[in-house]
């Protein structure tokens, strides 16, 4: 407002925008007084403004004024344009840093919070100084303490608070005489000589040397006082920035480690990257958490749309309320007479652009000291896993500290739950004394509400209760059960009170049940059965077949169709194999930063092999006898997850006999009987349509096959079994069977709608089907999944 220049307050995406911290908020009235109102009359702070507005002006000049109209932003020709551009420098740009310094000073005098153009941390005796923007500085400050305490390193940190105008004098004074500086930036401009911050710092230091040699307006710096500049890229697109990255950067400057390509500081290479699998990457072998002593670190695993992030925020708020209780129980005061905090919280979510239906995480730390680390937590004490299928796509046990706790969504028995843990992880559980708890969160939520959307969201509240059951938080802070319930209920009143007492009560009940029903399981054997896939094996055909990738069989052979021979060979970048080798090869967060990632190209068909099984709680089941083939469900499905087909009766019967009968001799016998089975089946189908009895096709076939001679009961069972797994409609699909059969007897067919593994269980198809009742949402089970997969494979 003083400079009359546009201003931007830049934040780190997903961290400073989404993180939750314990902090003191300045009073609203104080901020209003400090900032002033737009209509306040102030002294014009510069000669230029005095020339334009007079000795006094509005704090925010009113240029859109009908009483005093002016033309804003006219087109400028060449004889005028440059005048305006260069005159902004001395009239409006150059005074800005002075205004900022005055504002920092005034704010510090009023609040005790002192900032400046740059903020330094332990740089006085430092030989090496990190230079950063944004929340990375707090991570680095914790690492600075670690390096000083454990290695005796003379290292410090500088945070640049103002990037435009660039505070060259402040930077020169802060970095003069250092041996090394490590400039870390959330960008990588490969076509530029340096990334922006490093470029500005290099320019400022060069000007300082020039001032030493030739005089100038900036503070002088001797050539021997100019530090060596190391430059690193990190955190782009919210990429995780971890302690081992900070330590690796320092080790690189000291020649203790090299880049992945083998080059190091002794080779004159001063550029590196952090946090990705790249030839220029550096990383330390040391992986400390850098969390305060006695901290409790929590990691949530869930699915986007299930309310886990809301649960995490509620947990953070509740712990914050406990902090007030603890501080008042044994009060102490700071130099200003304010009650000192004795409990600190830091929390942040992690999710991608797809969020809903995709895996999500939430991280929370509670500690008796301020928490400066804001990365993903790889050292945790409690894992709250709201996702019952977590082991099918991740490892929720990863990073659990010895003696840590995993609370896992499961309505299974303890013995079955142990078998849900992959065998490869069970020894880790035993070796590290990991405590495994199960909690039927969805069942608790279903008992609390009949609304499915609320069941998903309220499930998380049960895990909130489970946290207080399994963690040491209540005992560590001497909080009894009455205090616990009182604080939680007050938070629920604050969060849900506007929806009515019933909502508060139901959420409180879910939380309480989560606390009470959390059950610890005893270890089984490492060699016990492994049912961690959460799937049953489908009924597979004999021999080798090309299987639709959307079938969800999760077995070898599920590949996309081969291109025709006459089609030219694809370049690697166009193939699914190349894409899968980097992005779906079990590498998780450690995919290579290579040529393919640089292009930003995906081969066609990647979605066909993507499973939504992880997120599905309910699946539509096709009721063939009710289907009218209106196709509303097909067009409504947002995921093209309802493939459909019409087939001849003979094709269905022959395919079943040819591919699902194990006895070769009886297979031949059955194939010979197919024409007669088809004939009799068709007769009964016509009778059923005329009688409107809607007799299932599978029942018709089963009765006919049971009467065959020279075929064993086992073969009859195999044949009837596969037919029973198929969604085959004829009764009400007029265009496929009834009309065709009437016009051309013997030619009516069967219609099928399959549910593929692309289905996320949104229920849109059931909604549009309506009263036809040909699709019904059904709880997803391993048995149902196997049946749907069997049908698709067929």
For each predicted feature, which ranges?
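Flexible, low-complexity linker and terminal segments
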Residues: 3-185, 190-285, 300-303, 308, ...
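Short, hinge-like loop/turn segments at secondary-structure boundaries
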Residues: 25-28, 362-366, 793
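N-terminal leader/propeptide and maturation segments of large enzyme subunits in energy/redox metabolism
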Residues: 43, 47-102, 472-477, 487-498, ...
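Glycine-rich, acidic loop regions that bind phosphate or pyrophosphate groups
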Residues: 157-161, 166, 170, 182-241, ...
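Active-site cofactor/cluster-binding pocket
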Residues: 165-169, 180, 184-186, 290-575, ...
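A generic alpha-to-beta junction signature in SAM-dependent methyltransferases
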Residues: 175, 398-401, 769
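Ferredoxin-type iron-sulfur electron-transfer modules and their immediate structural context
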Residues: 500-753, 758-759, 766-794
């Amino acid at each position: 407002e003083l400079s009359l220049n546009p201003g931007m307050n830049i934040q780190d995406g997903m961290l400073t925008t989404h993180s939750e911290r314990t902090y003191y908020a300045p009073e609203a009235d104080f901020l209003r007084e400090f900032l002033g109102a737009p209509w306040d009359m102030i002294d014009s702070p510069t000669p230029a403004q005095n020339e334009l507005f007079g000795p006094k002006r509005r704090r925010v000049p009113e240029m859109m004024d009908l009483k005093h109209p002016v033309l804003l932003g006219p087109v400028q020709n060449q004889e005028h344009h440059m005048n305006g551009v260069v005159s902004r420098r001395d009239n409006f740009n150059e005074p800005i840093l002075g205004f900022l310094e005055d504002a920092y000073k005034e704010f510090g005098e009023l609040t005790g919070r002192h900032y400046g153009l740059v903020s330094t941390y332990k740089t006085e005796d430092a030989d090496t100084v990190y230079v950063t923007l944004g929340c990375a500085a707090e991570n680095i400050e914790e690492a600075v303490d670690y390096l000083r305490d454990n290695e005796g390193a003379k290292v410090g940190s500088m945070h640049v608070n103002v990037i435009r105008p660039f505070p060259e004098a402040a930077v020169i004074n802060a970095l003069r005489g250092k041996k090394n500086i490590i400039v870390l930036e959330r960008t990588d401009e490969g076509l530029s000589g340096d990334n922006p911050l490093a470029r500005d710092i290099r320019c400022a230091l060069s000007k300082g040397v020039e001032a030493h040699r030739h005089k100038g307006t900036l503070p002088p710096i001797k050539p021997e006082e100019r530090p060596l500049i190391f430059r690193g890229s990190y955190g782009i697109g919210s990429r995780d920035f971890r302690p081992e990255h900070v330590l690796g950067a320092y080790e690189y400057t000291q020649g203790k480690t090299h880049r992945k390509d083998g080059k190091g500081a002794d080779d004159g290479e001063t550029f590196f990257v952090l946090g990705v699998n790249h030839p220029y990457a550096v990383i330390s072998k040391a992986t400390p958490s850098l969390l305060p002593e006695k901290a409790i670190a929590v990691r949530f695993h869930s699915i986007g749309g299930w309310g886990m992030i809301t649960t995490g925020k509620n947990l953070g708020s509740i712990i914050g309320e406990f902090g007030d209780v603890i501080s008042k129980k044994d009060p102490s005061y700071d130099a200003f007479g304010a009650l000192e905090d004795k409990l600190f919280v830091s929390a942040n979510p992690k999710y991608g652009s797809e969020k809903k239906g995709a895996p999500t995480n939430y991280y929370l730390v509670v500690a008796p000291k301020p928490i400066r680390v804001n990365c993903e937590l790889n050292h945790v004490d409690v894992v709250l896993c709201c996702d019952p299928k977590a082991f099918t796509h991740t490892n929720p046990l990863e990073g659990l500290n010895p003696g840590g706790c995993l609370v896992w969504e499961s309505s299974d028995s303890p013995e079955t739950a142990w078998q849900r843990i992959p065998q490869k992880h069970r020894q880790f559980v035993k070796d590290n004394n990991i405590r495994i708890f199960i909690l039927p969160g969805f069942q608790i939520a279903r008992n609390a509400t009949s609304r499915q959307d609320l069941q998903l969201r309220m499930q998380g509240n049960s895990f909130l209760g489970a946290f207080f059951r399994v963690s040491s938080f209540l005992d560590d802070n001497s909080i009894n059960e009455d205090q616990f319930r009182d604080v939680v209920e007050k938070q629920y009143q604050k969060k849900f009170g506007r929806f009515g007492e019933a909502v508060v009560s139901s959420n409180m009940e879910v939380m309480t049940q989560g606390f009470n029903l959390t059950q610890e399981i005893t270890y089984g054997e490492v060699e016990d059965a492994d049912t961690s896939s959460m799937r049953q094996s489908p009924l597979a055909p004999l021999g080798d077949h090309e299987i639709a990738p959307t079938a969800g069989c999760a077995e070898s052979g599920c590949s996309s169709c081969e291109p025709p021979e006459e089609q030219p060979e694809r370049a690697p970048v166009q193939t699914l194999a190349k894409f899968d080798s980097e992005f779906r090869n079990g590498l998780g967060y450690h995919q290579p930063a290579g040529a393919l990632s640089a292009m930003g190209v995906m081969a066609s068909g990647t979605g066909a092999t993507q499973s939504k099984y992880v997120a599905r709680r309910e699946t539509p089941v096709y009721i063939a006898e009710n289907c009218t083939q209106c196709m509303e469900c097909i067009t409504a499905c947002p995921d093209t997850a309802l493939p459909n087909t019409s087939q001849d009766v003979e094709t269905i019967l022959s395919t079943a006999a040819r591919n699902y009968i194990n006895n070769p001799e009886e297979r031949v016998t059955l194939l010979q009987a197919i024409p007669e089975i088809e004939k009799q089946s068709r007769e009964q189908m016509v009778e059923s349509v005329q009688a409107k009895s809607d007799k299932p096709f599978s029942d018709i076939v089963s009765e006919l096959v049971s009467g065959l001679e020279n075929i064993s009961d086992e073969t009859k069972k195999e044949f009837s079994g596969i037919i029973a797994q198929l969604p085959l409609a004829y009764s009400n699909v007029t265009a496929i069977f009834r009309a065709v059969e009437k016009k051309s007897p013997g030619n009516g067919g069967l219609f099928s709608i399959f549910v593929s593994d692309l289905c996320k269980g949104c229920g849109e198809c059931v909604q549009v089907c309506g009263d036809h009742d040909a699709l019904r949402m059904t709880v997803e089970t391993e048995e149902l999944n196997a049946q749907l997969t069997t049908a698709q494979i067929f």
